[in-house]
UniProtKB/Swiss-Prot annotation:
SUPFAM superfamilies: TPR-like (SSF48452). This is Uncharacterized protein HI_0366. Residues 1-27 form the signal peptide. Keywords: Signal. It comes from the Bacteria. NCBIfam families: type_IV_pilW. The keyword Signal applies. Pfam families: TPR_8 (PF13181).
Amino acid sequence: MKTISKQLSAVIFPFIFSACVSQSASSLNHQTAAKARVELALSYLQQNNPQLAKINLDKALQHDKNYYLVHSALAHYYQQQGQIENAFREYEIAVNLNHKQGDVHNNFGTFLCSQKKFEQAQQQFELALNSPNYYHQADTFENIVLCAYSAQKMDIYQQTLEKLRQIDGKRAEKFNSLK
């Protein structure tokens, strides 16, 4: 499961950032500042510096506590720190703040799968795939394949692997060794 968790983590956060919708100049400035802090925090997490990551996430919250991206990044931070309840809470906040963000649904699904909550994960993956302006279907299909494999849901594994093969055959090939 460790290998699958690492693979899931590698797939979920390269595309956390999404475009902002048009808003007032003031709220956009707050959102821009919050996004900059989130980017710094994610950099610090990659450098294995959770203390500076958390400081920047807290500052991002001060800039815009109603920005889904801040809560999504906080969820990722808590997940990395093993604070499962906090991660779950932050994913729920992020989804409630903007339910149209496929990336958040995909990441939440990956988190739920890592917690062995397969059915809930599947729901989040479906929401991701059905989100408007979501362009990372291959990532989500890959996450579904990994999740189904870890849950021993071989019918879903095979069906989704075929979907992945149709849109990104090269990605699907790496699963040949899992059979």
